[in-house]
């Protein structure tokens, strides 16, 4: 049984009218703004004076302008943002990518190799996850075929060391929620950005979508459980500071019977 976590994991507090939340000097959260479909969080990485900033994920359709505006309001020059690094390419994470690219000409797209090929080929099965959801979203948002075809500038692989913004982040391939899911890990500070593989409150990502795999998700959770994590920055919902030892392991153990 899950234990109540309020006050235990010390969630980073946020106001509903505040989109940008400072995690540290070189790391900010741009909060998702959920609608009928969830809008993923976006993270801004890099030392402010480096001129080499990165966004982790983009978010839902129609949210790009507001996210760029929130960056400007915080004093960030969009031209200093050099790349978008995707934790995975589901719709709620990649939906407004083209909007962001329109605001920041020349920005690069970095995606794990398992999802880069389909993205470049216009194979949107991973983006939508299931056919029924695709039909609903195309009708709701007037999305055309090929709307999520992109050129990928860098194909990420497990173990890559990303030296960006005056810092270093390790790429961990954590499939299961999606084929090309990745986490970014700052080992020195114990900061983990796991996309939708694990959340607060002992929750994990779905494993019933296209290219999802429950056994792979189980292995990915087990792998993450072996990391030293002090701050957990998921793709949705609460972000967590002062994560107790064993939190990810307990989450993995709780879900293991459903993932085997």
Question: What is each stretch, according to the model?
Answer:
Residues 1-18:
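N-terminal amphipathic/basic-hydrophobic helices that include classical n-h-c signal peptides
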Residues 29, 54-57, 83-85, 171-173:
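Short catalytic-loop micro-motif centered on adjacent basic/acidic residues
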Residues 60-62, 161, 168-255, 259:
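Metallo-beta-lactamase
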Residues 23-30, 140-145, 165-167:
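Short Pro/Gly-enriched beta-strand edge/turn motifs at strand-loop
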Residues 54-56, 85, 109, 191-193, ...:
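Residue-level marker for buried hydrophobic side chains located in beta-strands
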